[in-house]
Amino acid sequence: MGRNPRIQFAGALYHVTTRGNAKQRVCLDDWDFAWLVAQIGEVVTRYSWVCQSYCLLGNHFHVSVATPEPNLAKGMRILNGSYAQRFNRRYGRVGHVFQGRYGAELIRRHEHLLEVGRYIALNPVRAGLCSRPELWPWSSYRATIGLDEPPPWLAIDDLLAPFSGGPTPAAVRYRAFVEDGLHALRAGSRSAGSGDLVPGHGRGHGPRTRPRTWSAGSATSG
């Protein structure tokens, strides 16, 4: 039976997940992590994607991207393929590095992009790798809240814009929004980004305006 085709269209917004084959690690040291981040940036730039967030863990990674052209499959094939070749060459391995195809969830709702961004930021905490999301170095979260310089291909404004317009800086309000998710995670919430904490609710750290939306054929404000 053939594989179901990916849903691709101009302006689509995705939460993409790629996992190591048989749950094996795909980043064994800092050099691997840094090289994978660089590869993500190269593919984002090459295919004119808009990347709002990413997080790399030992055996998988997450990215959220908008694709002004219907080219997610092409870009992910280059990203995963080039990294797998380098990984196998570096460690003298053969065979698959990643487990089957990547996962791609369409982000359809306005508030879902913020929920996905928070979910991605909290992944290292959820995995027990650190106690707070800003302590994990292989994530875009530190750049989004102003602790690191963002790379030119990272669209942090797409997550910060909904929190702008008040006396408190947008990065501070976005950090508080993620903190809400961290509190829920520690309290045993079933998922910090599954809708338990919808932007605009909880402890008052939600956005003042609606996040940017992505329409077919372009990436425009909605």
Task: Name the predicted role of every residue range.
Residues 63:
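Conserved metal-phosphate-binding beta-hairpin within the catalytic cores
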